[in-house]
């Protein structure tokens, strides 16, 4: 719950640009759930980061980007899970090497619990974990994986001696160090969640390869994934749409909480349950399983209604039209005629990723 308390306090927190004091403050989750409120807060967050870091230097957490600010927003760690890079930067005028060293160590040794780290404040709440999330995804200059603090500290010292860079953006001098993840970092992260994926697959009758493909496309297996649409976690579940539908189908009232969806097992379960709903309820009128899979994939991104409207404004007629088409033609139609460019690309990405998981 700590994360969402800070989210509700972003505006005053950033105006003062100081560490937050959360004691004695009440958290109104219902207010934070409001999408407009979330958008306003994110806009304020971005504006204040720009004031501190300078124009074109705004960097925020996203589906495939972990971004954590510390030191009164003067130091940040960025993991780009798509590119496979860790970039640690600071604009601190005093002891920039020390700030970078601490950020490198904490980033390399952080755990995998998104509820334990506040991405929306400068609170240094990153706990050193006995099972670091990045263990096996990054190696030091000797080729060894990094689990212990002494090894992370030694590697940080090496990086400061050999890879420290600086640039002047006209407002600040930015000191940075970039670390590459191992080439198969994506597979390393996917492996962490295979047990959860298999359990959800058996529970809901959804192919493991499809679940993994959705996770790769949505978050690149980043458990800290957030988005401008307030989608959360590995499968980027939105509380008030997919989350609400799944809870209702399971006889639960209300919406899944943010902390619930940031738990990897819950997120995978909810996302997979929604895939099953799309397949067995919303798009059940599509007979061919391959055509229905294409529709389900596209609907996971843009909704079942938008998929059917590509073919007809009448849902029954849309299903009949799809049933009269070959699967390849359905794929071609969805990737060329869907009104959302994102949804058109989404089907291509997920379908391509699913093929790779079927071969493994």
Curated annotation (Swiss-Prot):
Q: Which SUPFAM superfamilies did the record assign?
A: Lysozyme-like
EC class: lyase
One GO BP annotation is: cell wall macromolecule catabolic process
Extract the GO molecular function terms from the UniProt entry: hydrolase activity, acting on glycosyl bonds; peptidoglycan lytic transglycosylase activity
Residues bearing covalent lipid (N-palmitoyl cysteine)?
A: 17
S-diacylglycerol cysteine lipid sites: 17
Determine the domain of life of the protein's source: Bacteria
* The keyword Membrane belongs to this UniProt entry's keyword annotation: yes
Please verify whether the record's keywords include Repressor.
no
Function noted in UniProt: Murein-degrading enzyme. May play a role in recycling of muropeptides during cell elongation and/or cell division.
Protein name in UniProt: Membrane-bound lytic murein transglycosylase C
Q: In which organism is this protein found?
A: Klebsiella pneumoniae (strain 342)
